[in-house]
Amino acid sequence: MEKKKTAVPAFLGVAAVWIGSHFGPGFATGAFSVRWYVKYGWVGLVTPLLAMFVTGGVMYYMLEYAREHGTPGYRPFARSCYGEKLGGVVAVLYDVCFLMTMMCAGGLAFSGEGKLLQGFLGVNYWTTAIVTILVSAALCLYGSKLLAKSSGYMMYAIVGVVLLITVLALTRGDCDVTGAFANSAANAKDSSFLHAILGAMQYGCFQSTIVFNVMSVSDVLKDKREARKAILSGYVITIVLMVCLIFTLFSYTNVFDVCAETLPVMAVLNRLGMKWLQWLYVILMTLAVLTSAAGLAHAGNVRFDGLFQFIPNKQLRRFVITAILLGIAAFGAALGFQTMLQQGTSIVGWTAIPVIVIPAFTFVAAKVRRGA
């Protein structure tokens, strides 16, 4: 029988897990944009290409190895790729990286959404956290196919809303694109080109840690061609979203101090005076939280499922694992948004270089090329 066509092809569903995991509230709020790009001036419009080249390379090599060898979980991946003895050590290092990412990226997700909803609707932070945990757990109940498909649909919504915000902010607001470029050096918080390049590379390394989320749905891809399409699609869409938000914020740097705002995108939307657009942005943030949290939680389910076999019901087991992992994220959020944004992302990024990034571009890449 002919397979039923879907609005979300498998490769695009995998790409959506990457995009959704990346496009969490840290980026959706604009906080990542000003932290890693806008503060360097106009050069920050170009450096995302470098950052996502690093992330995309790691994604492709590790995703393709996981697909080819049937190891969506990073523990069996480590033992298959590095051997039984060394693989055991690498798996522990992966555990450390994953849990750090869960606390940092997940913490940013909860904290960013909590700040937005508390300021916009007066909703208590823990109410936001509990609802997010429950919905993310529901998305993880039925495995990789549901997660990839649901992430794909949410990705369509995210792309549409970001493009709409960009167009309206640039055409209906009081932005000053000409002034932003003309006074780029004066408005930049750091005008060093070298710092901008190093910052982009560090950001690319930090985002490489979400490779475990993408690997966890590798089983929905049928061949290497689909893996390549997934990563290429993820790269292009992520770059478009990043540049849209960065350019939107950059265009206001000559109007007010964008980089000083905790929620830069909302600060721009407030200047537009469009209440409906603010509501749409709140929906965007909620989708960003759910895709980011669900992607992290599913990767954790694939990894820790074996430790919870004492719970016989598979769906209940996934729910419990998700609740525990997102509870760790909620604890990270309690440390504060700025702490996670400044110190947390830097620590995770530096840790990822020797544990994930360098091995992916050398050892794992060589095995993928050889088909070993």
Range-by-range predicted roles:
Residues A109-G119, I133-M154, V220-D223, I328-Q343:
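Membrane-water interface regions at transmembrane-helix termini and the short interhelical loops
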Residues T6-P9, R35-L63, S233-V243, G344-V357:
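Extracellular loop-to-transmembrane helix junctions
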Residues E2-A10, K39-G44, E68-T101, G119-Y125, ...:
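Transmembrane-helix boundary/entry motifs in multi-pass membrane transporters
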Residues L249-K275:
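Membrane-interface interhelical connector segments
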Residues L49-P76, T248-V255:
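Juxtamembrane transmembrane-helix boundary signature
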Residues P25, S136, C140, A157-N187, ...:
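Hydrophobic alpha-helical segments and their helix-loop junctions in multi-pass secondary transporters
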Residues A7-A28, T101-M102, A169-D174, A182-I239, ...:
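Hydrophobic, membrane-embedded alpha-helices of multi-pass small-molecule transporters
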Residues F11-S21, V46-F53, A91-L99, G119-G143, ...:
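Transmembrane alpha-helical segments of multi-pass small-molecule transport proteins
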